[in-house]
Amino acid sequence: MIEFKNVDKVYPGGFKALKDINLTIKDGEFVAIIGRSGAGKSTLIRTINKMHDINAGTLTVDGVDVKSLKGKELRKFRRNIGMIFQSFNLVERISVIKNVMSSFVPDLNPIQSLLGIYPKECKLKALEALEQVDILDKAFERADNLSGGQQHR
């Protein structure tokens, strides 16, 4: 469950993107957030995984106080949240599987990260993810070979 209680988000300079937001999204519920450009839709979504901090109120995800998360706890929390952005940032010249595995970089030690050495479990999870979105057959192709719809997946 995701729960916003009296949430405010004010950007530097004083722009208030969110004001007194109260919203509960229960497990299994599908929700559409619609509104005009600049209404705060993206800001609201980005507070869920703490890409943006809230300034007031409380935000909990499955009982976890998002505002209090830091460091390793925040990284562990984010592993369970998937976000699809309006514009995707694939590295076109590398393989599809390497693009997927790049999501594991925060969990690697500095040497693994620098050299791009991924543990077997990361490779298996990446392959599973590609299978789930029906592009496993594209795993070792360059990302720029994917159609727009495949890139979104």
Regions found by a protein language model. Name each.
Residues 34-36:
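The feature captures the beta-strand-to-loop junction immediately N-terminal to the Walker
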Residues 49:
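Helix-to-loop junction immediately C-terminal to a conserved catalytic motif
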Residues 56-65, 77:
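Conserved ABC transporter NBD signature motif
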Residues 64-65, 108-138:
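Conserved ABC ATPase "signature" region
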Residues 141-150:
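Conserved ABC ATPase signature
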